[in-house]
């Protein structure tokens, strides 16, 4: 499945679409917007097109910075992260202050963005970031990187086989697929 990730989401108005938001748009919104069964077969490849910048807005997403750079190198396991770190972020006085008196999302918000992508993470066999401008953001998310869509399709075919079918999920920012047998 190929899908483009727009540079906007419900969580980045007037700020950068940071790596965690790219992840939630891909494996959360785009993957999960279906009825009956996923558009992508179990173990299939999701190719996303996005530059995957390592950009965070410290005014709106301060806890996302720490989540990405401190927690993800340790583990991408949502259950582990929840048990070990969610309360720490939720009760962090600096994050609480920025949430209450500034413009920041709640300190625990990056966890919920990570959880929303969990169903997709458990279903896909591989995610390839086509056009990612660096290697470390896709790697941190557990993805592979391709220079362009042609290279990403070749990588997917080497994983799924030369006769693999390609579905282009061409949708507005948020859509819902109705898939039936």
Across the structure, where does each feature detected by a protein language model lie?
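Generic detector of short, locally flexible boundary/turn motifs and exposed helical patches
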Residues: 10-15, 89-95, 129-135
């Amino acid at each position: 499945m190929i899908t483009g990730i727009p540079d906007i989401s419900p969580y980045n108005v007037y700020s950068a679409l940071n790596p965690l938001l790219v992840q939630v748009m891909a494996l959360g919104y785009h993957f999960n917007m279906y009825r009956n069964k996923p558009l992508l077969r179990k173990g299939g490849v999701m190719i996303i097109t996005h530059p995957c910048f390592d950009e965070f807005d410290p005014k709106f997403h301060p806890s996302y910075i720490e989540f990405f750079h401190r927690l993800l190198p340790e583990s991408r396991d949502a259950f582990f992260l929840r048990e070990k770190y969610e309360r720490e972020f939720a009760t962090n006085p600096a994050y609480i202050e920025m949430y209450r008196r500034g413009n920041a999302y709640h300190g625990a918000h990056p966890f919920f963005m990570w959880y929303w992508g969990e169903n997709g993470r458990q279903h896909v066999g591989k995610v390839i970031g086509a056009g990612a401008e660096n290697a470390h953001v896709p790697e941190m998310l557990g993805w592979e990187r391709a220079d362009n869509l042609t290279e990403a399709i070749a990588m997917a075919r080497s994983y799924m086989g030369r006769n693999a079918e390609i579905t282009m999920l061409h949708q507005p920012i948020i859509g819902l697929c109705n898939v039936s047998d």
